Amino acid sequence: MMNRTTPDQELVPASEPVWERPWSVEEIRRSSQSWSLAADAGLLQFLQEFSQQTISRTHEIKKQVDGLIRETKATDCRLHNVFNDFLMLSNTQFIENRVYDEEVEEPVLKAEAEKTEQEKTREQKEVDLIPKVQEAVNYGLQVLDSAFEQLDIKAGNSDSEEDDANGRVELILEPKDLYIDRPLPYLIGSKLFMEQEDVGLGELSSEEGSVGSDRGSIVDTEEEKEEEESDEDFAHHSDNEQNQHTTQMSDEEEDDDGCDLFADSEKEEEDIEDIEENTRPKRSRPTSFADELAARIKGDAMGRVDEEPTTLPSGEAKPRKTLKEKKERRTPSDDEEDNLFAPPKLTDEDFSPFGSGGGLFSGGKGLFDDEDEESDLFTEASQDRQAGASVKEESSSSKPGKKIPAGAVSVFLGDTDVFGAASVPSLKEPQKPEQPTPRKSPYGPPPTGLFDDDDGDDDDDFFSAPHSKPSKTRKVQSTADIFGDEEGDLFKEKAVASPEATVSQTDENKARAEKKVTLSYSKNLKPSSETKTQKGLFSDEEDSEDLFSSQSASNLKGASLLPGKLPTSVSLFDDEDEEDNLFGGTAAKKQTLSLQAQREEKAKASELSKKKASALLFSSDEEDQWNIPASQTHLASDSRSKGEPRDSGTLQSQEAKAVKKTSLFEEDKEDDLFAIAKDSQKKTQRVSLLFEDDVDSGGSLFGSPPTSVPPATKKKETVSEAPPLLFSDEEEKEAQLGVKSVDKKVESAKESLKFGRTDVAESEKEGLLTRSAQETVKHSDLFSSSSPWDKGTKPRTKTVLSLFDEEEDKMEDQNIIQAPQKEVGKGCDPDAHPKSTGVFQDEELLFSHKLQKDNDPDVDLFAGTKKTKLLEPSVGSLFGDDEDDDLFSSAKSQPLVQEKKRVVKKDHSVNSFKNQKHPESIQGSKEKGIWKPETPQDSSGLAPFKTKEPSTRIGKIQANLAINPAALLPTAASQISEVKPVLPELAFPSSEHRRSHGLESVPVLPGSGEAGVSFDLPAQADTLHSANKSRVKMRGKRRPQTRAARRLAAQESSEAEDMSVPRGPIAQWADGAISPNGHRPQLRAASGEDSTEEALAAAAAPWEGGPVPGVDTSPFAKSLGHSRGEADLFDSGDIFSTGTGSQSVERTKPKAKIAENPANPPVGGKAKSPMFPALGEASSDDDLFQSAKPKPAKKTNPFPLLEDEDDLFTDQKVKKNETKSSSQQDVILTTQDIFEDDIFATEAIKPSQKTREKEKTLESNLFDDNIDIFADLTVKPKEKSKKKVEAKSIFDDDMDDIFSTGIQAKTTKPKSRSAQAAPEPRFEHKVSNIFDDPLNAFGGQ
């Protein structure tokens, strides 16, 4: 070709430069002597062309070879086909030959023999044929008599039987049920099958003796009689029989005269048939006892059969058999009326037992045993039989989804077992009577409600049917089976602890949430081991019970709300919506959950790592994930605190779980920085929340309520959660720190009553109140934290929490905020300390005090809680105003109300809201949006809240509360108004602030003003509005939104926050928080925790410094934040401008404090992880943008959620890191301050701290701080030291562990290094990730 081209090229040269065309070999040779650059170019062209030709030629050859291979393969295939054809032919011929040989041989021989026989015996044969024919006829008649019932159309026309043909023509033969005399064995797997060794086959002999033998004997005797009589006195027997049945068969007596063997046999047959026929007609017109018996039996059988079909699809065959058996028994009864009458009585009795559920025979019963058994299943709830049937259907449908996934126990067995285990314990105390029908017994009490709830429970009986909740609880427990006994036990305990229905419902939700978590998270984590761990966690079922006994009160209160939750449970079953159903904690959510489940599952698939965090959305998931971080944090804390009063067994189990989860989640964490934020948070809450959940509930609870609420909102609110999480988280944190501080104070009052501990109860009450109160309260939060806290309890708590308690939590928060608001200064601590005074000192009393909650606190605490819940309406207005109207503005206005309660909350909220003021207008729509992401957060927890407007308000308030810890202070009130609007993302103002500032540094914050909208994604905000009740809807969206929107909103809102933070209290605490943010873009990026702490400290500072620094409502701000929070407040102001200096100062404090208060940073981290899982996801979304993004720098986790988790955990990790580094320590302290300021943060931190403190010192002060959120400044120092003591190791170990799988302890120092070193890069990453991750969080939006 070249030679070809060469001449052309040589001809062409004149027209084009020589160097632009490939040269030919000849040209190259010619110019070899006078080589030039053009020759080089030509040579290059030549070589390139040569290469291309070689490649193309190679491809051609390759194609040819491929074609050859294909042809070879096709040839081989055809060859094998031919072989196979030959083999088939050979086999066929072989078989045919064998068959033909045999056939040929036999016919020939037979034919010959027959011929000889025929020839010899034709006459004889005829003679012989007569008896043979007679015998055959007799046999045939016997068969007709024995195997067929003759429906005698001519029952009255037996005269016409004279014409055998006519009689036969008119005869209608109905085959008898062969299985009356010889019943089939029971259905395999049925109760009777399991219980009886003969599986219904051996009972034939026994029951045949009575019934079967009567039948058999009757039929046999009848047949024998008929044979004998037909041979001998067929007419006589007919006469006897007909004399017996004379009334029945007066016409047949005429036929009795016809005594031909065949006529008699036929008559006998017809008589029998007539008798049977008459019996049947008698059934319609029962004239004789046999008829009545038959009719009655038939009725019973029909009733049974009818029942059976409803109860047992498999029973359908049996009902037929039963009917046949009944018919046949009736027939024998009719055939031998005297004998039959006695036996039919027996038969009738048997039938009546059968009808009554005994079964014709035990075997018959076996046939119907399932029916009867199922009837029995529902028979105990016989009222519920229909309910049972529908329940079974529901259970089957829902259970399979549920049970199969995690528990994967048989739907029925699982349910029965789960409910046997779960419901039996539930039944155990309240429902023990109905243990036989575990499922039903839960249902049994409200059988109608069962179905109403079951059917409507998902949607209609959301709130109306706690009863069905039990059924669903059973289902959930079957689902809980996933958590097998744990949740089953939880449910048992819960059912016992709570009103069985309510608790069960709660359990269901928990189970669902937990299953979801366990499923989604445990899928990674080995749900079974996790379940086992959880079970171990709830091996202290008393505690679970206690949690739920207190929750039970909450559940009782929230029973109607819980039913809404229950729908979640239902959805839980429906979902594997579950994941959504967690969110669909509301009944309607089920549908929403389906959508969200799809959404979220898709998101989970795509954001599986992220959406492990998203999985946090599922309270269970988030709880699991949270629990692991909480658990991990709590693991360290718990391992440290194992010996502490907190249930060591539970702790250890939970720790084991936490350990599992830690490692599991550490994997997830790395993967799921987003998810880890949630995953770790989930982990944190799981392990931490499991034990620390309440302790961590303060933090994890906060984080977790944020997680729970945010987890609900997590995926949605991960994007939109910055405000919602900020709000929800911060609000939740602050609500939980503030509100929950108040709530805990109220709840502490409750839980003090419950737990009766003020000091330890304070520190632990933070955790335990958070557990118990927050379990109660945060049973809504349970979704977020209490659930994680008690994973087993979590289902309970969560269930209680999800619909009820989050709402309750928020309502309680609000109520506590309102009432405790008032109480906070006066009543919160009093409420909390008197009641929590001694209780928390015994950590184990946590659970036993939860039991106390059932016992003592139920009245007081729940009086408090109930008050809180009663306050809920006002809280509704509180939250309604604050959250609905004033996510940003009403929260401002309301903050006054809320401010008291949420002095911390609202201060933070104010700060957040100030920062969020830009978003405020957005959050006007966003309020509901963010609020609703909050509500999705609440979705888990607020599902109950859904019933209340506060749900959205709560979301808002939680968003506000996220900020509100500062707002909780009176001073913060004004700030709240100012600040609240500014920061949807500043809902976790500090964190968000820091984030914002960090984002400001990395100008991603411009959208921060719109972050609220961006967070919520107004559409989702609208969804969230309805999400209150159908949180699932929002959650599906919210998760992605939370991440994407939160990140975008965190960027924009943070920038807006950074801009708006300076003003008003935000400038105050935003100085602390934002300067930390501004300072923390790096620091916060490096140490998102510190930023969060600083932000929290800053947030705490306003209410702390502004409202009552001494009262520092947030325990964090109090103990840590007070020393550091005041510094943060003012240093935060300085931090705002001199954030580094302030942070350095703060950090130096924190260094000392963090050195002292490793627990504090860990608590901060934990709080942050709890806070920031939700709050931290909001805040850490800013942090995501900063700390989490620095974490991306660390982990290069693209997902803000992961980063958020990292950030959350970076806050925590960074707190640890910062604990290591003074700047970061300052941030940590600030974060802790913020956490202290943020009741939510404080509680979040405190729970970690508490967990650690409890674990280390049973930090009563933490809870005191929580209780003294408003008045606990004094306790704060204890918290500090305890935080110092515990936080470091706990935080380092747990938080790092929790938040960074690999970064546990090492992360603390590496993190501080990487946090400071990578703060800006991370922040840059986060900024990029803010947009990238949010898009990713949104799935590419």
Swiss-Prot record:
It is found in: Early endosome membrane; Cell membrane. One of its GO terms (biological process) is endocytic recycling. A motif (LFa 19) lies at residues 1262-1270. A motif (LFa 9) lies at residues 690-702. A motif (LFa 21) lies at residues 1330-1338. Keywords: Cell membrane, Endosome, Lipid-binding, Membrane, Phosphoprotein, Protein transport, Transport. Residues 519-536, 1135-1145 have a biased composition (Polar residues). Changing D1333A: Disrupts interaction with VPS35. A motif (LFa 12) lies at residues 839-847. Residues 1-220 are annotated as: Sufficient for interaction with WASHC3, WASHC4 and WASHC5. Residues 1029-1047 are annotated as: Required for interaction with F-actin-capping protein subunit alpha (CAPZA1 or CAPZA2 or CAPZA3). GO terms for molecular function: phosphatidylinositol phosphate binding; phosphatidylinositol-3,4,5-trisphosphate binding; phosphatidylinositol-3,4-bisphosphate binding; phosphatidylinositol-3,5-bisphosphate binding; phosphatidylinositol-3-phosphate binding; phosphatidylinositol-4,5-bisphosphate binding; phosphatidylinositol-4-phosphate binding; phosphatidylinositol-5-phosphate binding. A motif (LFa 16) lies at residues 1171-1185. A motif (LFa 14) lies at residues 878-888. GO terms for cellular component: cytosol; early endosome; early endosome membrane; endosome; intracellular membrane-bounded organelle; nucleolus; plasma membrane; WASH complex. A motif (LFa 5) lies at residues 537-548. Residues 202-214, 1094-1110 have a biased composition (Low complexity). Residues 233-242, 293-307, 507-517, 598-609, 637-647, 751-768, 823-834, 898-909, 917-931 have a biased composition (Basic and acidic residues). A motif (LFa 4) lies at residues 482-491. Residues 220-232, 250-259, 266-276, 451-462 have a biased composition (Acidic residues). A motif (LFa 18) lies at residues 1234-1240. In human, WASHC2 has undergone evolutionary duplication, with 2 highly homologous family members WASHC2A and WASHC2C. Acts as a component of the WASH core complex that functions as a nucleation-promoting factor (NPF) at the surface of endosomes, where it recruits and activates the Arp2/3 complex to induce actin polymerization, playing a key role in the fission of tubules that serve as transport intermediates during endosome sorting. Mediates the recruitment of the WASH core complex to endosome membranes via binding to phospholipids and VPS35 of the retromer CSC. Component of the WASH core complex also described as WASH regulatory complex (SHRC) composed of WASH (WASHC1, WASH2P or WASH3P), WASHC2 (WASHC2A or WASHC2C), WASHC3, WASHC4 and WASHC5; in the complex interacts (via N-terminus) directly with WASHC1. The WASH core complex associates via WASHC2 with the F-actin-capping protein dimer (formed by CAPZA1, CAPZA2 or CAPZA3 and CAPZB) in a transient or substoichiometric manner which was initially described as WASH complex. Interacts with VPS35; mediates the association with the retromer CSC complex. Interacts with FKBP15. This is WASH complex subunit 2C. It comes from Homo sapiens.
